[in-house]
């Protein structure tokens, strides 16, 4: 089912048989997250938390990362990464690979600092995200999703070897920046019972869960994935980092082909498991956010709300991280009219 109890957690750890020749990632510390919070203050928005207007008795809150300057949480990690990149970044430039949001965030930060930026994006990236990347001055390199995923797993792209690669989710600077969201959630709702986080590569989940584990370990953290690509749920079920078949959908910001082993090692001790939602549930959440709260969220951003509404993350105080709002207006119109694809 993609969940773990405390006993199941022990079993999963003992059963995991991950390959030894893989990248390793040191756990992020609360000090790194707090330093990132100070470092990016003034560069990013401290986003509000509002209650979801719903007819249910559930107490659901929305952490509105869609209000960030580039429309997603990625600007936090990108700001932290650029600040820590070193003096050579000016001459070498930076690049990343992204479905759109990371590329926008890095391009925006690079532009603020006079740094050249390139973005490797999948050839089916939403036009809204492509326009924003261009507006921020980055060079776009469109390739197949498989080629993007190859850059994700190898951390390199031959034609850009002279530039500094900033990984979209397994870079410690990115994860620490993401963790600042967890600090803010606990500052605003200290008695929160659970937090639901969209899971793409794991950097957002790892950062937020680390902050919450350190500051309020009784609060539970859940990931959410779409049914069209749920490698984390498969990994929890099997006890090791798994690769799954990925079906493209309007939920383009989350749902990869696999969980990188280094991210699996980091995330699995920190969260309860992954809630898998159908495209219909996520589309309904997109509509609900618009109709009840006047909030525009992309599929990935609305997935956390869809997961919370299932009740699987608990029925007390639940905070949903609305990770982004970069959705094509045409696609939003289709979803609002009841079309799901």
Question: Where would I find each of the regions flagged by the language model?
Answer:
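PLP-dependent amino-acid enzyme catalytic core
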Residues: 3, 13-341
């Amino acid at each position: 089912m993609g969940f773990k109890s405390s006993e199941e957690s022990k079993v999963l750890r003992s059963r995991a048989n991950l390959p030894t020749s893989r990248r390793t990632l040191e756990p992020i510390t609360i000090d790194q997250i707090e330093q990132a919070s100070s470092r990016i203050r003034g560069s990013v928005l401290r986003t509000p938390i509002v209650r979801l207007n719903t007819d249910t008795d559930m107490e659901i809150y929305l952490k509105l990362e869609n209000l960030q300057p580039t429309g997603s949480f990625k600007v936090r990690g990108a700001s932290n990464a650029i600040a820590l990149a070193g003096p050579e970044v000016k001459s070498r430039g930076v690049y990343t690979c992204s479905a759109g949001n990371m590329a926008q965030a890095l391009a925006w930060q690079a532009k603020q600092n006079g740094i050249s930026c390139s973005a490797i994006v999948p050839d089916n990236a939403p036009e809204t995200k492509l326009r924003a990347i261009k507006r921020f001055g980055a060079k776009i390199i469109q390739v197949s999703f498989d080629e993007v995923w190859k850059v994700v797993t190898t951390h390199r792209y031959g034609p850009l070897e002279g530039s500094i690669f900033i990984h979209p989710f397994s870079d410690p600077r990115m994860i620490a920046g993401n963790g600042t969201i967890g600090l803010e959630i606990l500052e605003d709702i200290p008695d929160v019972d659970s937090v639901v986080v969209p899971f793409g590569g794991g950097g957002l989940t790892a950062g937020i869960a680390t902050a919450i584990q350190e500051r309020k370990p009784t609060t539970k953290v859940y990931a959410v994935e779409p049914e069209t690509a749920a490698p984390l749920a498969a990994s929890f079920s099997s006890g090791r980092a798994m690769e799954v078949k990925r079906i493209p959908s309007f939920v383009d910001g989350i749902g990869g082909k696999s969980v990188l082993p280094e991210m699996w090692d980091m995330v699995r001790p920190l969260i309860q498991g992954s809630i898998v939602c159908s495209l219909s549930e996520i589309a309904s959440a997109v509509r609900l956010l618009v109709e009840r709260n006047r909030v525009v969220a992309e599929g990935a951003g609305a997935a956390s709300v869809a997961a919370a509404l299932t009740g699987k993350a608990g029925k007390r105080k639940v905070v949903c991280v609305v990770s982004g709002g970069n959705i094509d207006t045409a696609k939003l119109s289709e979803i609002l009219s009841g079309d799901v694809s």
